[in-house]
């Protein structure tokens, strides 16, 4: 008779445990019910990126001293720096600077270690093209400042999503 009672007690404990697990899952589901959807209508609405967002690299040709620190700290040796040594002034003169964003991993090492701060990260993240060769940006394309999302009048920006008050 006692084995039957212990089996009935185990069955009761398992039932209570299962009900508790179902209740925990249901509470998590209910906690998410008050939140607004995370998805946005992408081409027409854009989220404002954070200050530390690592987007396309901006390059200032006049500040660059062709020291090639960016190439040495890049984990994939990506920036291509062409320079010529000016013998009369004993300095390097930058001829060409390019970065292939099809290969870039956007780690930000080049920006962090640049001694003259000629490199910076922008908030531009729309770099998609139909041809991968168009992702190879020269100093002219790198020097172009992107239009700020905040200043774009055709797009509704989402600064802070309003919360539902209960």
UniProtKB/Swiss-Prot annotation:
Protein keywords: 4Fe-4S, Chloroplast, Iron, Iron-sulfur, Membrane, Metal-binding, NAD, NADP, Plastid, Plastoquinone, Quinone, Repeat, Thylakoid, Translocase
Any Pfam family matching the protein: Fer4
Cofactor note: Binds 2 [4Fe-4S] clusters per subunit.
Ligand binding ([4Fe-4S] cluster 1): 64, 67, 70, 114
Catalytic activity, reaction form: a plastoquinone + NADH + (n+1) H(+)(in) = a plastoquinol + NAD(+) + n H(+)(out); a plastoquinone + NADPH + (n+1) H(+)(in) = a plastoquinol + NADP(+) + n H(+)(out)
GO biological process: photosynthesis, light reaction
Residue ranges constituting the 4Fe-4S ferredoxin-type domain according to the UniProt record: 55-84, 95-124
Predominant location category: plastid
Entry annotated with the keyword NAD: yes
Cofactor requirements of the protein: [4Fe-4S] cluster
A GO molecular function held by the record: 4 iron, 4 sulfur cluster binding
PANTHER family the UniProt entry points to: NAD(P)H-QUINONE OXIDOREDUCTASE SUBUNIT I, CHLOROPLASTIC
Official protein name in the record: NAD(P)H-quinone oxidoreductase subunit I, chloroplastic
Organism of this sequence: Melampodium leucanthum
């Amino acid at each position: 008779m006692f084995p039957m009672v212990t089996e009935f007690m185990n069955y009761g404990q398992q039932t209570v445990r299962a009900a508790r697990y179902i209740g925990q899952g249901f509470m998590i589901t209910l906690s998410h019910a008050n939140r607004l959807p995370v998805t946005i209508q992408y081409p027409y609405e854009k989220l404002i990126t954070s200050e530390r967002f690592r987007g396309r690299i901006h390059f200032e040709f006049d500040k660059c001293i062709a020291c090639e620190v960016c190439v040495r700290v890049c984990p994939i040796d990506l920036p291509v720096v062409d320079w010529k040594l000016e013998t009369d002034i004993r300095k390097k003169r930058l001829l060409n600077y390019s970065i292939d964003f099809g290969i870039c991993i956007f780690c930000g090492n080049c920006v962090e270690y640049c001694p003259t701060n000629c490199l910076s990260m922008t908030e531009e993240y729309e770099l998609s093209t139909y041809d991968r060769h168009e992702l190879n940006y020269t100093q002219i394309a790198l020097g172009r400042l992107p239009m700020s999302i905040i200043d774009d009048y055709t797009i509704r920006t989402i600064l802070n999503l309003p919360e539902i008050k209960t």
